[in-house]
Amino acid sequence: MYFIVKICGIMNTGDALMIIKKFNKEEDYDRVIKFLRENYKENKNMVSWLPQRFDDLIYRIDVLYHDERGREKNLDYTYLFEDDSKNIVGLVIPDGDSFNTCIKKGYEDIFSSMLDLGEKELRPLFDKNEDGTINFLVISHDSIKNQQEELLRRGYTKDEAGDYDNVQHPLETNYTIELPEGYKQVFGENLDEIMKCTACHYGFHPNDDNGDLTVMPKEGFLSYQGRKNSQFYKDSFESLILKDDGDICSYCFCYVDKETSTAFIEPVSTREKYRHKGFAKQMLHGVMNRLKEMGIENAYINSFDWRVNVYRNAGFETEDTISCWHKKI
């Protein structure tokens, strides 16, 4: 599917024609990864999605949403914005019931057209209200002022709570793992996959935690397996806090892209009965130690609301804040 639209004022060179193309994995995947890598190398931050995060959306999140929950695939509602030479200059990427964008420097004016498209084409991803409307959610970095202005102009309202982009530089760290007797930080290569997946699930769904890690979780195992299809999987790893009796306390997964020398840590989960003991901090220090051995320069983690404090305690610094903007349409 293609659209052609006129965008005004692109790069201060007057009007420009923009091609809008629905994402086709076979045709566009490599192009998108290249675009995201180039954007990161130029910006050196998470204003543009990391390539690993895009893979996580394809191979884990979409499997969870579609195959396990029966919802629409995000990938089916992803759009490329191309210039008249068919170079990607922007992406519309839904993540569940949210609208996200990645835009090349100099093309900031396409955000309005992206919103036009999103408000029309992404509707099936949102639950309908009784009156047939949807609560459309836009995710925008606070550092991108023109997006805030456009959202306010359109009547969007900003939530009080928001997200945080957090970064740490493994090559500058020198961590020693410090845990109480009977606990240890380990990597996940030799542990049972069902137990790891179930422990992660229990961290997000404490009411399901009956203490038994040997049972298949209610959801998440298909997406756990799906992640293995990512091109980044071979260089990626898990970090956990484990009791001597084999019980798993905390779990996280770390995607690694050697080309950009970045890591993306997602998900991070601590079971409720093991919280407030500093286990997430030590688990993430284990991640930093391995990334340092690998020579990775920057490690990123996204956090919502109060969870940012967990990552700050583990040595991460917040490099940008992210707001959630709502409008009923």
Describe the predicted segments one by one.
Residues K6-I61, E178-G220:
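Short amphipathic alpha-helix that is part of the acyltransferase structural core
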Residues G90, E160-D163, S250, D320:
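A structural microfeature
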Residues F136-I139, I265, N298-S303:
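Conserved hydrophobic beta-strand within the GNAT/NAT acetyltransferase core sheet
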Residues Y2-T13, D95-Y183, E189, S323-K328:
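Acyl-donor-binding surface of acyltransferase catalytic domains
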Residues Q147-L151, Y311-R312, F316:
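Conserved active-site tyrosine of GNAT-family acetyltransferases
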Residues E108-P124, T270, H276-N289, E293, ...:
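Conserved acetyl-CoA-binding loop-helix of GNAT-fold acetyltransferases
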Residues N210-G211, G220-Q225, F232-D244, I248-D257:
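Phosphate-binding active sites in nucleotide-utilizing proteins
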Residues N24-E26, R37-K128, D244, I248-E266, ...:
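Conserved donor-binding loop and adjoining core beta-sheet/short helix segment
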